[in-house]
Design a protein with these regions (language model features):
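Short helix-capping/turn signature of helix-turn-helix
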Residues: 38-41, 49-52, 142, 161-168
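Structural recognition of an alpha-helix C-terminal capping motif at a helix-to-coil junction
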Residues: 59-66, 79-91
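C-terminal edge and immediately downstream basic/flexible tail or linker adjoining helix-turn-helix-like DNA-binding
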Residues: 1-9, 13, 105-111, 119, ...
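DNA-recognition helix of helix-turn-helix
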Residues: 94, 156, 162-165, 170-201
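Short, charged helix-capping/linker segments at alpha-helix termini
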Residues: 4-5, 10, 25-34, 44-63, ...
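Amphipathic alpha-helical segment used for protein-protein interaction
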Residues: 26-29, 101, 122, 126-158, ...
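Arg/Lys-rich amphipathic alpha helix in sigma70-family domain 2
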Residues: 73-77, 87-108, 199
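Sigma70-family region 2
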Residues: 25-26, 52-53, 65-80, 99-101
Length: 215
């Protein structure tokens, strides 16, 4: 094996997504379609808070996959596949914002049916509440969190999305955003402070600590 071949094989042993991408690189039938099915919704969820529109996020996700396909023959894994893909997505989202020179509006991730996800908020509510009360509480809290996220700058917002929705660590977020791990830690720290200021009044009124929503 060549040095590049050995490197690819080593990464592939650790990351099934890389193995799938290597199948795409080899033009294996059905591999690219499988890759799209695996990551399309995740890309939309990541980019929607950045660009403010599900339709635009879907368009950018398609563009990201197009770039992946066009560059497949030059693909040589140097990190997790998801990190490489999300780097492409982040750059596309930032380029879209720069070209439009507008402030994005943040909305909650949605399911395939278009309904807003509540990211487990209902599990955190007291059991004694009735279902109508829980639904009203969820809607109110989702609106508060959406507005809080909208108050973050672009970098803070992306760092929060990658950290919370994709469960990415500082090092991987740093690769995606072109920053150092220390800078990512600082971004998330400032984002938590900003979120705490917006959320604390609502959450403290419920007698709950805001930490569970920020950590």
């Amino acid at each position: 094996l060549t040095a590049i071949g050995q490197s690819s094989a080593q990464y592939a042993l650790r990351d099934p997504d890389i193995r799938l991408m290597l199948r795409v690189r080899a033009d294996e039938a059905g591999a690219f379609e499988q890759l799209v099915l695996l990551f399309q919704q995740r890309l939309v969820v990541i980019m929607k808070p950045m660009v403010g529109s599900r339709e635009e996020a879907e368009d950018l996700a398609q563009e990201a996959f197009l770039r992946v396909y066009k560059s497949r023959k030059n693909y040589h894994p140097k990190a997790k596949f998801s990190t490489w893909l999300f780097t492409i997505a982040n750059n596309l989202a930032l380029n879209s914002l720069r070209s439009k020179k507008r402030r994005p509006q943040v909305s909650f991730p949605t399911t395939e049916s278009g309904q807003q996800q509540q990211v487990g908020i209902d599990q955190r509510l007291p059991e004694k509440q009735s279902q109508p009360e829980i639904r009203l509480h969820n809607v109110e809290l989702a609106d508060v969190i959406t507005k809080a996220l909208d108050g973050l700058n672009e970098r803070q917002r992306m760092a929060v999305v990658l950290n919370k929705y994709e469960d990415m660590n500082y090092a991987d977020i740093a690769v995606v955003m072109g920053l150092t791990s220390k800078a990512v830690k600082s971004l998330l720290s400032r984002a938590r402070v900003n979120l705490r200021e917006v959320l604390k009044k609502y959450i403290y009124m419920d007698g709950q600590s805001s930490e569970k929503y920020e950590s």
